[in-house]
């Protein structure tokens, strides 16, 4: 057992020794501030170009505390103290806050929020691609209440569109881009109640293949929802949980192939080797399903079978950028959320770091002159780190103090609730007796729950590129797709962009017409 006095002594030592020498000089901070000021002054000249391309990065569950902790982790992975590190999203010039509540929930879920930031309207928790007039699980409240997404608006404008996720492709976030469902959990017809089936509602995997048949790129997990029940998985032949789930007997991957024009090149791949062997210049449509369910955590990923998020984004962009009219790409770092729900902060933060790497990859492959990039989260988590940790303290390490009550140490990372509530012999578990640096270590929580919960605070929105300045303050979450559509002249925002197809240069005044005068009918 670690002595409380030793913990405090170590903390004092680290505080003195981890201050970089250059930071002891006031001129370092003054020069840094002046450089930042100089860059800020350049922003007075706003980028009012048309956004030919729009990329939306969605970190599921990536609240501000997660962003900060991921920043420190990224720096420490590069052998720095961490706090001074800049994430790729930190480099974006415009930042806003998004209010995440659902129409019926103070603390939201990922389905209602996805409907907000993709379809432009707030909705009830647990529903996707429908207005708040639809009640969760009630199929008969769906018809007539469907709302379309920015992915649909982009496709209708002749742009290429893509979805890349580390979850299953029919999970909450991606499904709001193409589906209309009273329940986010209706992954296949196997998960639907008989009443919903009899009333004519379709499962989300079915809708993926039928609602917008020409989505150019789809990558993520979710193979088992595409195949008839008990169909053996190509990768996990002996795993019953990986087998097909569909009761209707449909092979949705074959159906996906049948919908593609014969003169186009469509490819289905199920592993990393096949994906990276593709020549994107000869791919028109791509479907990549790399796991039966969600993809593996980045720390657990098999380099032979599972591509990283960065690799999927690179392939997607090489395909989508061939369209001279531009593209819309939704990228989800979906397993940040799963790591937090399981209380596995190390998994969650490594997922966030990988998503940031994908953001950097996309930035290197596009230009701010014609590409609007937005990075945000759907909601936060009850994840925190603190305890007066010294500079350079491992983000997964101990705080330099002990509890006032049980005199035991604690990790800097803690959860408000979740599965990390551990009691040993009637007392809080002594973390010095366990491997708290393990990939699957569950950080301690204040309240015992099987799954840790979402947080209800605002989340950050980072933006760069054309019209990024429209994301500038505290906004309702459903405002985000209106900005993306306005910037790219799609959806309801066509009238002020009549010049866009003529090749003539826009005037800033034309692009800054009040949004209030625009008709919103095409959004719904």
UniProtKB/Swiss-Prot annotation:
Q: Where does Mg(2+) bind?
A: 60, 173, 332
Q: Name the Gene3D superfamilies on file.
A: Alkaline Phosphatase, subunit A
- Compartments, as annotated in UniProt: Cell membrane; Extracellular vesicle membrane; Mitochondrion membrane; Mitochondrion intermembrane space
Mainly resides where? membrane
Q: Which Pfam families match?
A: Alk_phosphatase
PTM details? N-glycosylated.
Q: Where is the signal peptide?
A: 1-17
Per the annotation, how and in what number is the cofactor bound?
Binds 1 Mg(2+) ion. Binds 2 Zn(2+) ions.
How activity is regulated?
Phosphatase activity is specifically inhibited by 5-((5-chloro-2-methoxyphenyl)sulfonamido)nicotinamide (SBI-425).
Domain comment (free text): Calcium-binding is structural and does not influence the alkaline phosphatase activity. At very high concentrations, calcium can however substitute for zinc at zinc-binding sites, leading to strongly reduced enzyme activity.
The note filed under miscellaneous reads: In most mammals there are four different isozymes: placental (ALPP), germ cell (ALPG), intestinal (ALPI) and tissue non-specific (liver/bone/kidney) (ALPL/TNAP).
Family statement: Belongs to the alkaline phosphatase family.
This one is known as Alkaline phosphatase, tissue-nonspecific isozyme
């Amino acid at each position: 057992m670690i002595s409380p006095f030793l913990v405090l002594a170590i903390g004092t030592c680290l505080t003195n020794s981890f201050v970089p020498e250059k930071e002891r000089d006031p001129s370092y901070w003054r020069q840094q501030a002046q450089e930042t000021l100089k860059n800020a002054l350049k922003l007075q000249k706003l980028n009012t170009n048309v956004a030919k391309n729009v990329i939306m990065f969605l970190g599921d569950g990536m609240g501000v505390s997660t962003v900060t902790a991921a920043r420190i982790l990224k720096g420490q992975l590069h052998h720095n103290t961490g706090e001074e590190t800049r994430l790729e999203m930190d480099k974006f010039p415009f930042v806003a806050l998004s209010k995440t509540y659902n129409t019926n929930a103070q603390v939201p879920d990922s389905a209602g929020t996805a409907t907000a930031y993709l379809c432009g309207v707030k909705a009830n928790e647990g529903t996707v691609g429908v207005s708040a007039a639809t009640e969760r699980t009630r199929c008969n409240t769906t018809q007539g209440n469907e709302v379309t997404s920015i992915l649909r608006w982009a496709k209708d404008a002749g742009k290429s569109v893509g979805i890349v996720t580390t979850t299953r492709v029919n999970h909450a976030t991606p499904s709001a881009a193409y589906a209309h469902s009273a329940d986010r959990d209706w992954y296949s017809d196997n998960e639907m109640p008989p009443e919903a089936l009899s009333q004519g509602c379709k499962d989300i995997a079915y809708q993926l293949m039928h609602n917008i048949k020409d989505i150019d790129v789809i990558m993520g997990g979710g193979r088992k929802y595409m195949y008839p029940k008990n169909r053996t998985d190509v990768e996990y032949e002996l795993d019953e949980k990986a087998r097909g789930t569909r009761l209707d007997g449909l092979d949705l991957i074959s159906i996906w192939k049948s919908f593609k024009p014969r003169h186009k090149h469509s490819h289905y791949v199920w592993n990393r080797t096949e994906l990276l062997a593709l020549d994107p210049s000869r791919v028109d449509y791509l479907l990549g399903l790399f796991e039966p369910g969600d993809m593996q955590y980045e720390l657990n990923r098999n380099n032979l079978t599972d591509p990283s998020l960065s690799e999927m984004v690179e392939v997607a962009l090489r395909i989508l950028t061939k369209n001279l009219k531009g593209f819309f790409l939704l990228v989800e770092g979906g397993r940040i959320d799963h790591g937090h729900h399981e209380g596995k902060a190390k998994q969650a933060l490594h997922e966030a770091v990988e998503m940031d790497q994908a953001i950097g990859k996309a930035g290197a492959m596009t230009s701010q002159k014609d590409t609007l990039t937005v990075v945000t989260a759907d909601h936060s988590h009850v994840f925190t780190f603190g305890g007066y940790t010294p500079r350079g303290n491992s983000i997964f390490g101990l705080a330099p103090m002990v509890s006032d009550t049980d005199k035991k140490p604690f990790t800097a990372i803690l959860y408000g609730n979740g599965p990390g509530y551990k009691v040993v012999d009637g007392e809080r578990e002594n973390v010095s007796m366990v491997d708290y640096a393990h990939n699957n270590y569950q950080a301690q929580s204040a309240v015992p729950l099987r799954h840790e919960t979402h947080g209800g605070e605002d989340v950050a929105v980072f933006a760069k590129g054309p019209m990024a300045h429209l994301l500038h303050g505290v906004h309702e979450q459903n405002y985000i797709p209106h900005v993306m559509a306005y910037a790219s002249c799609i959806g309801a925002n066509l009238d002020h962009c009549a010049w866009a197809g003529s090749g003539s240069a826009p005037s800033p005044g034309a692009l800054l017409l009040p949004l209030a005068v625009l008709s919103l009918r095409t959004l719904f």
